[in-house]
């Protein structure tokens, strides 16, 4: 039986009654492999900053892995992000999955006085951020001269005690090729990358990996999917919904596209019930089909 990983999105909403730690603990108790959170800072809706919230989650859980899904690279200096990641991973007992992306929300960057990068710069900046992290994590003194980011005899200690996986959320041809060159994982979203687009996108990644001298099997493909387990669910674009068996069949079908992990975002307000139904009625059926 193939080992499939299942993750659960933890909302960054900071509205009254929100309890991301309780949500993560429930996911851990129900056997999820990882929890994740997105990275949006700007706006009138109350929300937590991602690193801070996930650090609090890591401190209050013991087994479950913790993923950034995905950090907007322009928000933070890549070398500082690399050090933050090393510290987070060490303090959490080796549980970090570092997800990164080029940064889609130009209005957020402008609002915070950051440059809204061109599509080319977003891809290049993302790839440079990965190379900087890997260099700082492995070399005693690391100098890097990129188009957008640089380090000069930079040193961080201690080095990570193990390989920290880096997943990239990418869609365009150049970004997919960069994923193949440098990433450990690819995490597209169902609504932006529907199933019919996946084969060509994945081929682009695997081809770039081969061209870079990498083993394509080293790259974990993770599908980010909005789900609702509900016998009365009305079909919605971008949402996998229906009775447990129907949801499980749909998710299991994505295995044929090369996905080895899934990150679930819950649709609807009944979060605890949905989390439990996924864990007890959907995930076992998908595992059995793998």
Kindly give the residue locations of the regions a language model identified.
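Active-site-adjacent structural elements that line small-molecule/cofactor binding pockets in enzymes
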Residues: 1-290
């Amino acid at each position: 039986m193939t080992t499939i990983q299942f993750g659960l999105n933890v909302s960054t909403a900071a509205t009254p009654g929100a309890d991301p730690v309780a949500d993560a603990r429930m996911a851990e108790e129900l056997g999820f492999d990882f929890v994740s959170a997105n990275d949006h800072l700007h706006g009138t809706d109350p929300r937590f900053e991602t690193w801070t919230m996930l650090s609090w989650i890591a401190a209050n859980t013991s087994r479950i892995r913790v993923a950034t899904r995905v950090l907007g690279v322009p928000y933070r200096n890549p070398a500082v992000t690399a050090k933050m990641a090393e510290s987070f991973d060490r303090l959490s007992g080796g549980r970090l999955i570092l997800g990164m992306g080029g940064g889609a929300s130009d209005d957020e960057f402008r609002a915070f006085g950051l440059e809204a990068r061109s599509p080319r710069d977003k891809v290049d900046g993302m790839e440079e951020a990965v190379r900087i992290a890997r260099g700082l994590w492995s070399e005693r003194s690391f100098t890097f001269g990129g188009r957008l980011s640089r380090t000069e005899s930079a040193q961080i200690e201690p080095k990570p005690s193990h390989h920290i996986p880096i997943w990239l959320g990418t869609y365009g041809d150049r970004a997919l090729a960069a994923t193949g060159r440098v990433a450990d994982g690819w995490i597209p979203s169902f609504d932006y990358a529907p199933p019919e687009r996946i084969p060509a996108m994945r081929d682009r990644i695997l081809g770039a990996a081969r061209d870079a001298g990498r083993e394509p099997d080293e790259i974990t493909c993770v599908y980010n999917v909005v789900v609702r387990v509900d016998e009365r669910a009305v079909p919605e674009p971008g949402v996998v919904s229906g009775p447990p068996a129907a949801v499980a069949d749909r998710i299991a079908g994505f295995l044929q596209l090369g996905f080895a992990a899934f990150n679930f975002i819950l649709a609807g307000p009944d979060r605890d019930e949905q989390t439990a139904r996924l864990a007890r009625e959907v995930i076992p059926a998908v595992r059995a089909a793998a």
